[in-house]
From Swiss-Prot:
It comes from Rhodobacter capsulatus. One of its GO terms (molecular function) is metal ion binding. The keyword Iron-sulfur applies. [2Fe-2S] cluster binds at C42, C47, C50, C102. Belongs to the 2Fe2S plant-type ferredoxin family. Residues 2-119 form the 2Fe-2S ferredoxin-type domain. This is Ferredoxin-5. Keywords: 2Fe-2S, Electron transport, Iron, Iron-sulfur, Metal-binding, Nitrogen fixation, Transport. Ferredoxins are iron-sulfur proteins that transfer electrons in a wide variety of metabolic reactions. This ferredoxin probably participates in nitrogen fixation.
Length: 123
């Protein structure tokens, strides 16, 4: 049952929401539900306009969230993830710093989601 805190220079203040345990909604879906203005164009992992930076806030070890093939390809294309980071996520369960909000389904851990407000803007 994670708390997800959204922060961006385009927001007046940070906003924290509670994600229900077992919910399979993506960060983008949760943001839309709570009127948090993460930019997006396709919502399907093709355009990378919903690029976010994720910081883990728990004291427990961070868990990697499965990277989809589309997400891996787009993040590599943007040079926002390395082959080593992908391997660390898949083999050692170490989360990458950058994700696509439309592909990232939060687990049971508190995270800070930072976005610039510019589609595809690097954080």
């Amino acid at each position: 049952m994670p708390n997800i805190t959204f922060t961006s220079p385009i927001m007046k203040k940070d906003k924290t929401i509670y994600a229900v345990a077992g919910n399979t909604a993506t960060i983008l879906a949760l943001a839309k539900e709570h009127a948090i203005p993460i930019p997006f164009e396709c919502g399907d992992g093709d355009c990378a306009s919903c690029l976010i930076e994720v910081t883990h806030l728990d004291n427990k070890p961070a868990m990697a969230m499965m990277l989809t093939e589309k997400e891996k390809a787009r993040l590599k294309e943007l040079q926002m993830i390395t082959a080593e980071e992908i391997e660390a996520a898949e083999v050692s369960d170490l989360p990458p710093r950058f994700r696509l909000a439309c592909q990232f389904i939060p687990r049971d851990e508190d995270v800070m989601v930072h976005f610039t407000g510019t589609p595809g803007g690097s954080v």
